[in-house]
Amino acid sequence: MFLLKSIPQVDKFIKNEKFASLPLTLLVQITAEVLQDLRERILKNEIESFSEDELVKKVLQKYKDITKPSLQKIINATGVIVHTNLGRSLIDANAFERVKGIVTSYNNLEYDLEKGKRGERYSHISDAICRLLGCEDVLIVNNNASAVFLILNTFAKQKEVVVSRGELVEIGGSFRVPDVMKQSGAKLVEVGATNKTHLYDYENAISKKTSMLMKVHKSNYSIEGFSSEVEFKELVKLAREKNLIDYYDMGSGHLVNLPYGLDQHEPSVLKYMQENPSLLSFSGDKLLGSVQAGIIVGKKEYIAKLKKNQLLRMLRVDKLTLALLEDSVISVLLNKLDEIPTLKMLFASTCELKENALVLQDAIKDICDCEVLETKTVIGGGTTPNKMIPSIALAIKIDNYKQNKMEKLFRAKNIIGRIENDRFLLDFRTIRKSEIQEIAHVVKEIANV
């Protein structure tokens, strides 16, 4: 009972001079939490004494923890370029500077400077994408799942959409194509078998209620062996014959020729635009290497109907997304791929990666065991399943730490590596030159040098 009576009152405790600079409302909340925790521990006989100085330190530490941003900078040393858990594609610092003046000022987001009246936010991006892809019109929403939902809700609500059974994918986070379709109001008609679907499967499934033939890219898995699927150009032709909409959910998609034979595994937006499709959609933050966005391209008449759907108000993107996306598309249009970090990392040769690895090795070789290795990695982001690309890594061992301990120590410093063959690796496919000295500093900290 004595300890309970010794717990200070909140209103008196917060007058401590060490709290002078703290905002009162937050200070009161934190103090109440610290004192409540103290009270509970006393009742559980977990402590025998405490001091006011200890409580002050706990309050200050909790304040520091609460006000520290949860979203932090990470050095990605996993080698996975489009790392879903680490923010997918990076935005180039120079690109961010180019759009900084736009997003920190009033701008013409929905204002027509020539006519002096209300304009359309999508007009800023449409010209660049139309020139790049040769499409009639463009619409941008907040991600590709939104694009799928909006398209289905607009053109197939209470109608049938024919899809191959082998393409009913789960795109991550338990979001499944059939569930998205159901929520949109569309009725799924699945055809074919898991491993084989033929054009006649689509033909036989078409009824008076059918509005769309849909193809979904199997971005995060592959079917090999005794398998076949219908080419999108065949679906486009069939859709025209039956007066239906053809739509390809391309997932990642890509706008440039990819290295390491990756073109064989990922659909090219440019290639499929040659079929003059009704609609295509793909992600902005995967192989395009830009911001999170769902990019819908296709015929003007269909894009116009999508723009009239009231759901678009909930799915639209803001000025920062549009400004950065426009910058990325212009970089691709001008073939300035070095301005897009995702593509720069993807196209980097192993010779370049080895040069960077040797710089770090030279900086830390006197304080730890480190070896430059040839390895392989994946692109990530649900792209090119089962396809590995060459990379260079630095295997590091400090003192007698096991690889799991090494991974934990580096992770505590916001450097995420990977464990391979019982060794802790830093993969240079995703490490930038500007990060090498920072990594070297962390190695010295861990080694207590």
Swiss-Prot record:
Q: Which GO terms describe its molecular function?
A: L-seryl-tRNA(Sec) selenium transferase activity
Q: Which residues carry this modification: N6-(pyridoxal phosphate)lysine?
A: 286
Question: What are its cofactors?
Answer: pyridoxal 5'-phosphate
What reaction gets catalysed by this protein?
A: L-seryl-tRNA(Sec) + selenophosphate + H(+) = L-selenocysteinyl-tRNA(Sec) + phosphate
GO CC aspect terms:
cytoplasm
Task: List localization entries.
Answer: Cytoplasm
Transmembrane intervals: none
* Listed InterPro entries: PyrdxlP-dep_Trfase, PyrdxlP-dep_Trfase_major, SelA-like, SelA_trans
What SUPFAM superfamilies would the database entry show? PLP-dependent transferases (SSF53383)
Its job: Converts seryl-tRNA(Sec) to selenocysteinyl-tRNA(Sec) required for selenoprotein biosynthesis.
Q: What is this protein called?
A: L-seryl-tRNA(Sec) selenium transferase
